């Protein structure tokens, strides 16, 4: 495949055109008066969204040089989304501003390597200021504010705050599509795993087709049970106690399953059997989680334990257990608080150490199940188009909320960046080109407020001047068109989102400025298909 090469100013300008096309498409969504972007889909209805990263991912440009520029800025949005889950529009906007200001200076003959140094110095200072000015999230109200600003909807803010309150910071909150028009919150208290009863004859409520066991014993094993003689000794002890039993095993089949079902139907003894959750090593760990939560032991040959030797003190207990066709929920396991805390700490350490995203996700699920619970936000809307748009906004709001809990909140509406300018202005250096890098960031930090104002139909420069000369904490509420104390008014952003957007934008933009040559593939031209021959039409002497 032949390649095309561009050098110097020409290469940077070609890539900048791509950066501008992508950034201009994304930045119209910024702020409370930002608009939506409609994305064409090959299948189904178009997607309407104001989510920066979703828009960026859809953009592919025909010109290979422009496309390279667009892909670089796309990385800014994607990385910010991965780290903080929100702030992708701000990150794209900042990258565009740094590239625009930087290229002016590089074109005028400044050394891009020294400019890059100045950019890094200014960004580090601004990030430090953002961290210093952040305050910890204090209760449900702060969480609701962060989510409401991110989703541009107070109702969504309230819903997510409720979910966080119910499952705690360690709990898992998922977003699913609802079959109704209403958006609702569904919370699963206790530990739930996706395994249901092995036989429908085990249900205690035939109408709802579920088995509910109050204060039952729980037998946990990683073995397959097929011989009833293995579990007969422990069954006899439980019958004498007048209790019910939940068996969680690799499988229960044949004679053992048939005997349990017959005894249940006769009313002699209630026992529900379910398969153990997970696979391989993950199954062993999940059984251990359940054992710690319920105060029982896992009966495993690896540990030298046989099912026939099980005693009552090896069984777990819980306040209640609900088993449906697909799920088992254990509520209020009677395990030791200290052991549960140790297990939570152990899983947290594993999350920090693992490099696999898949493992991290699975560990996070296990942590939620043992620590808090699972909340499901069921998103409803009148049409599929609105549903998709709403779901994206809720996912962003959820990510913003988690980021706020991690690193606290700062004044929203781009105000935190303006406050950081004062610290950046204090920086100085003997080298004039490093000073240029600092000045580029100083100018770029104004860009979010400019764009929010522009999307609201106002002049950004006037607003920036007023905020910079105003009291500490003052910012511009673009929705109401007034100057207010941003934190008191509840216009806040997560510090992690604000910080990540700036760091990722500067990282890609400063590398962009050091480009001196661009190599792209020349697209192959497909030869035009030849016209089919017209047999039998030839005439003598004619070709």
UniProtKB/Swiss-Prot annotation:
Mind listing the UniProt keywords for this protein, alphabetically? Answer: ATP-binding, Chaperone, Cytoplasm, Isomerase, Nucleotide-binding
Q: Which domain of life is it from?
A: Bacteria
One Pfam family for this entry, by name? Cpn60_TCP1
Per the UniProt record, which EC number(s) apply here? 5.6.1.7
The chemistry this enzyme catalyses reads: ATP + H2O + a folded polypeptide = ADP + phosphate + an unfolded polypeptide
Binding, ATP: 29-32, 86-90, 413, 477-479, 493
Q: Where found?
A: Cytoplasm
- What is one GO cellular-component annotation here? cytoplasm
Question: Which molecular function GO terms apply here?
Answer: ATP binding; ATP-dependent protein folding chaperone; isomerase activity; unfolded protein binding
Provide a GO biological process annotation: protein refolding
NCBIfam families named in the record: GroEL, PRK00013.1, PRK12849.1, PRK12850.1, PRK12851.1
- Identify the PANTHER family for this entry: 60 KDA HEAT SHOCK PROTEIN, MITOCHONDRIAL
Subunit annotation: Forms a cylinder of 14 subunits composed of two heptameric rings stacked back-to-back. Interacts with the co-chaperonin GroES.
User: What does the protein in this record do?
Assistant: Together with its co-chaperonin GroES, plays an essential role in assisting protein folding. The GroEL-GroES system forms a nano-cage that allows encapsulation of the non-native substrate proteins and provides a physical environment optimized to promote and accelerate protein folding.
- HAMAP family listed in its UniProt record: CH60 (MF_00600)
Homology family: Belongs to the chaperonin (HSP60) family.
Q: Report what the protein is called.
A: Chaperonin GroEL
Which organism encodes this protein?
Clostridium botulinum
Q: What is the lineage of its organism?
A: Bacteria, Bacillati, Bacillota, Clostridia, Eubacteriales
């Amino acid at each position: 495949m032949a390649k095309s090469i561009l050098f110097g100013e020409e290469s940077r300008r070609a890539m900048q055109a791509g950066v501008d096309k992508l950034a201009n498409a994304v930045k119209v969504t910024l702020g409370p008066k930002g608009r939506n972007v409609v994305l064409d889909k090959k299948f189904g209805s178009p997607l309407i969204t104001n989510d920066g990263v979703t828009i960026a991912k859809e953009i592919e440009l025909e010109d290979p040089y422009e496309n390279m520029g667009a892909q670089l800025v796309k990385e800014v949005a994607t990385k910010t989304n991965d780290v903080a889950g929100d702030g992708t529009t701000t990150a794209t906007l900042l990258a565009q501003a740094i590239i625009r200001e930087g290229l002016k200076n590089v074109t005028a003959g400044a050394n891009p390597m020294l400019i890059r140094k100045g950019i890094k110095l200014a960004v580090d200072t601004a990030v430090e200021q953002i961290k210093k000015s952040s305050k910890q999230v204090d209760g449900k109200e702060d969480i609701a504010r962060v989510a409401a600003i991110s989703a541009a909807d107070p109702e969504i803010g309230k819903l997510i705050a409720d979910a966080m309150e119910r499952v705690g910071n360690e709990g898992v909150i998922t977003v699913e599509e609802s079959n109704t028009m209403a958006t609702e919150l569904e919370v699963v208290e206790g530990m739930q795993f996706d395994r249901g009863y092995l036989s429908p004859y085990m249900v205690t409520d035939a109408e709802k087709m579920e088995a509910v066991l109050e204060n039952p014993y729980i037998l946990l094993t990683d073995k397959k049970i097929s011989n009833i003689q293995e579990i007969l000794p422990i069954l006899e002890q439980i019958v004498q106690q007048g209790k019910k039993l939940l068996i969680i095993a690799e499988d229960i089949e044949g004679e053992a399953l048939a005997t349990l079902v017959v005894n249940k139907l006769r009313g002699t003894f209630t026992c529900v059997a379910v398969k153990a959750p997970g696979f391989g090593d993950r199954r062993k760990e999940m059984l251990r989680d359940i054992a710690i939560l319920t105060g029982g032991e896992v009966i495993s040959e690896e540990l030298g334990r046989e099912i026939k030797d099980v005693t009552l003190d090896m069984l777990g207990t819980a306040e209640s257990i609900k088993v449906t066709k697909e799920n088992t929920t254990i509520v209020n396991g009677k395990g030791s608080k200290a052991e549960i805390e140790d297990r939570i700490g152990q899983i947290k350490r594993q999350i920090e150490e693992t490099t696999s995203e898949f493992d991290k996700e699975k560990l996070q699920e296990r942590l939620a199940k043992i620590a808090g619970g699972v909340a499901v936000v069921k998103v409803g809307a009148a049409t599929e188009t609105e549903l998709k748009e709403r779901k994206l906004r809720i996912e962003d709001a959820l990510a913003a909320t988690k980021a706020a809990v991690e690193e606290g909140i700062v004044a929203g509406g781009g105000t935190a960046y303006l406050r950081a300018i004062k610290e950046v202005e204090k920086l100085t250096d003997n080298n004039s080109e490093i000073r240029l890098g600092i000045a580029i960031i100083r100018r770029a930090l104004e860009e979010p407020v400019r764009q929010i104002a522009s999307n609201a139909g106002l002049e950004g420069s006037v607003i920036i001047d007023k905020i910079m000369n105003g009291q500490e904490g003052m910012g511009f509420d673009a929705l109401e068109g007034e100057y207010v104390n941003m934190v008191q008014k509840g216009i806040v952003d997560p510090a992690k989102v604000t910080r990540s957007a700036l760091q990722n934008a500067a990282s890609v933009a400063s590398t962009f400025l050091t480009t001196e040559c661009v190599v792209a593939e020349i697209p192959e031209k497909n030869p035009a298909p030849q016209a089919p021959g017209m047999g039998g039409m030839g005439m003598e002497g004619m070709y």
